């Protein structure tokens, strides 16, 4: 897991810099119902199981949480920004929900 964790840490840093997002801390946790979360203090938590997802879905989850550093809800503004960055946020989100279910 250490190798994958290093990759994901670098990926979060790379995507944050590329799109101009700032976050406070990054943690990996065991989460039963979510792939990630972003706190009011812009701490990003990623589910440890993210390592088993395809890279494009990893990027989507990371970007989803990075967008939450600016927009704390799932408003049209949120989906608009995420869609602008990912190209197809709603489609990727649907793919994630349908094919990779957390129990």
Indicate residue ranges for each PLM-predicted region:
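Active-site-proximal or metal-binding-adjacent scaffold patches in catalytic folds
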Residues: 1-60, 69-103
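Walker B catalytic acidic pair
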Residues: 65
């Amino acid at each position: 897991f250490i190798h994958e964790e290093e990759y994901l840490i670098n990926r979060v840093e790379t995507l944050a810099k590329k799109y101009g997002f700032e976050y406070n801390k990054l943690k990996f946790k065991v989460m039963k119902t979510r792939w990630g979360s972003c706190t009011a203090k812009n701490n990003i938590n990623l589910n440890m199981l993210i390592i088993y997802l395809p890279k494009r879905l990893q990027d989507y989850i990371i970007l989803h949480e990075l967008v939450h550093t600016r927009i704390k809800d799932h408003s049209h503004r949120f989906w608009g920004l995420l869609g602008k960055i990912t190209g197809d946020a709603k489609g990727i989100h649907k793919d994630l929900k349908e094919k990779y279910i957390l129990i």
